Amino acid sequence: MGVALGAGLAVSIAGIGGGIGMGIAGGKAFEAIARQPEVGGDVRTLLFITLAFIETLTIYGLLIAFMLVGKA
């Protein structure tokens, strides 16, 4: 039971943290584009790269959950 609880916590905390991080990053990027529309393309490119890194951390949480369940 402890392994299942740990796996669930790993996925949920990683997912919640990733979702909050993506929301904050997206909001700030849109604020920057609204303030200076001429740099919209550059900001959008950096936003997509940042979102990919955030999603990678979320996938690591899922990987840890699979590793925990695999040991049980």
UniProtKB/Swiss-Prot annotation:
Keywords: ATP synthesis, Cell membrane, CF(0), Hydrogen ion transport, Ion transport, Lipid-binding, Membrane, Transmembrane, Transmembrane helix, Transport. This is ATP synthase subunit c. Its main location: membrane. F(1)F(0) ATP synthase produces ATP from ADP in the presence of a proton or sodium gradient. F-type ATPases consist of two structural domains, F(1) containing the extramembraneous catalytic core and F(0) containing the membrane proton channel, linked together by a central stalk and a peripheral stalk. During catalysis, ATP synthesis in the catalytic domain of F(1) is coupled via a rotary mechanism of the central stalk subunits to proton translocation. GO terms for molecular function: lipid binding; proton-transporting ATP synthase activity, rotational mechanism. The record marks E55 as: Reversibly protonated during proton transport. The lineage of its organism: Bacteria, Bacillati, Bacillota, Clostridia, Eubacteriales. It comes from the Bacteria. InterPro entries: ATP_synth_csu_bac/chlpt, ATP_synth_F0_csu, ATP_synth_F0_csu_DDCD_BS, ATP_synth_F0_csu_sf, ATPase_proteolipid_c-like_dom, F/V-ATP_Csub_sf. SUPFAM superfamilies: F1F0 ATP synthase subunit C (SSF81333). It is a multi-pass membrane protein. It is found in: Cell membrane. Belongs to the ATPase C chain family. The chain crosses the membrane at residues 4-24, 46-66. GO terms for cellular component: plasma membrane; proton-transporting ATP synthase complex; proton-transporting two-sector ATPase complex, proton-transporting domain. F-type ATPases have 2 components, F(1) - the catalytic core - and F(0) - the membrane proton channel. F(1) has five subunits: alpha(3), beta(3), gamma(1), delta(1), epsilon(1). F(0) has three main subunits: a(1), b(2) and c(10-14). The alpha and beta chains form an alternating ring which encloses part of the gamma chain. F(1) is attached to F(0) by a central stalk formed by the gamma and epsilon chains, while a peripheral stalk is formed by the delta and b chains.
